């Protein structure tokens, strides 16, 4: 659902060299040729809301991300066109879908605020600085602005190019472990996640290290949502009916006005899917495969055939789950592409959730 609105779907033609210079000067107040020792007017990469140029300053190679002019207005215009399609897809009035639209629109517009991205980049890189095999570019506030973001230039391959070089499984496992630890640390320690696990946002090294770039899309996870959503990944909690009733009600899967039959059907379906998704967290080590991803897809198709899911009488599910689910499905897909075998370290956070719900001795 969120991918219908994702910035990856937005394509803009590259800016010409003169337009890049004008855009930079308007935002920063100086020409890029006055700020940097060297600046390449030809972009090296086009991103969803801007393009990246290479520059030199004091012997350092820098990446300069320049935002497309008018992109915020384009996003809002595109969303207005897509809303009727989404409403028809779910068969619900727009006012009942408003909270989901607002969540997506807020996230997309946040991506156009490079000052916010710089702040979050620095916060997350500081929080995750001790995670093995993960590294980040240094950001330069003194050269940046709300429409221009400057950071160190990182070398490395995106996932497809990396896999084309036939790395060893040992190196692939090391990369996967770094990504897994990076995401779980963010979520369970910082309650904020890099919510765009697109392969293009990671630069993979032949020694197994991972460079992380692009913090435009970050989902801050409310503590209240965290303690009502993630406990469902813990079998001891999922098997406690009294707690499950509270959780499913709080995250808006089940409502008081639902009939007993609908409650049973939805709870059964949701718990079956959660049990499948939580499989990696229930063992010390887990082997990701494409067959596992196919199993998730198949279960999703099966659940979609439930009448109250296919044509709901009211919106179901917390808005906060949109980007969390999108993030973890992206991670799972990357793990499968790497055919990774990882240590899940689930005990580092599952005990905290069991304690929160009074199930320490379960």
Question: For the regions a protein language model found, what residue spans apply to each?
Answer:
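Short amphipathic alpha-helical recognition elements used for nucleic-acid or partner binding
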Residues: 228-231
């Amino acid at each position: 659902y969120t991918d219908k609105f994702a910035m990856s779907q937005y394509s803009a033609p590259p800016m010409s060299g003169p337009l890049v210079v004008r855009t930079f000067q308007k935002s920063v107040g100086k020409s890029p040729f006055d700020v940097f020792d060297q600046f390449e007017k030809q972009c090296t990469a086009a991103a969803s809301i801007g393009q990246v140029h290479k520059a030199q300053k004091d012997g350092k190679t820098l990446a300069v991300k320049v935002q497309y002019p008018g992109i915020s207005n384009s996003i809002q215009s595109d969303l207005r066109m897509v809303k009727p399609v989404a409403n028809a897809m779910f068969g619900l009035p727009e006012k009942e879908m408003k909270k989901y639209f607002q969540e997506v629109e807020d996230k997309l517009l946040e991506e156009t605020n490079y000052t916010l991205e710089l702040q979050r980049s620095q916060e997350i890189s500081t929080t995750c600085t001790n995670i093995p095999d993960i590294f980040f570019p240094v950001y330069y506030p003194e050269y940046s602005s709300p429409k221009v973001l400057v950071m160190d230039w990182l070398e490395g391959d995106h996932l497809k190019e990396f896999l084309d070089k036939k790395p060893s499984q040992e190196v692939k496992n090391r990369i996967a472990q770094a990504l897994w630890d990076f995401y779980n640390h963010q979520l369970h320690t910082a309650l904020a996640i890099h919510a765009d696990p697109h392969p293009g946002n990671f630069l993979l090294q032949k020694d197994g290290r991972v460079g992380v770039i692009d913090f435009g899309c970050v989902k801050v996870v409310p503590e209240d949502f965290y303690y009502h959503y993630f406990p469902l990944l813990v079998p001891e909690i999922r098997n406690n009916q009294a707690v499950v009733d509270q959780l499913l009600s709080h995250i808006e899967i089940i409502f008081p006005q639902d009939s007993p039959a609908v409650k049973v059907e939805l709870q059964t379906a949701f718990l079956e899917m959660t049990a499948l998704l939580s499989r990696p967290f229930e063992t010390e080590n887990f082997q990701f495969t494409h067959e596992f991803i196919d199993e998730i897809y198949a279960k999703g198709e099966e659940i979609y055939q439930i009448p109250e899911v296919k044509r709901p009488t009211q919106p179901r599910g917390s808005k906060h789950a949109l980007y969390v689910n999108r993030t973890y499905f992206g991670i799972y897909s990357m793990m499968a592409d790497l055919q990774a075998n990882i240590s899940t370290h689930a005990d580092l956070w599952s005990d905290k959730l069991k304690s929160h719900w009074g199930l320490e001795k379960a």
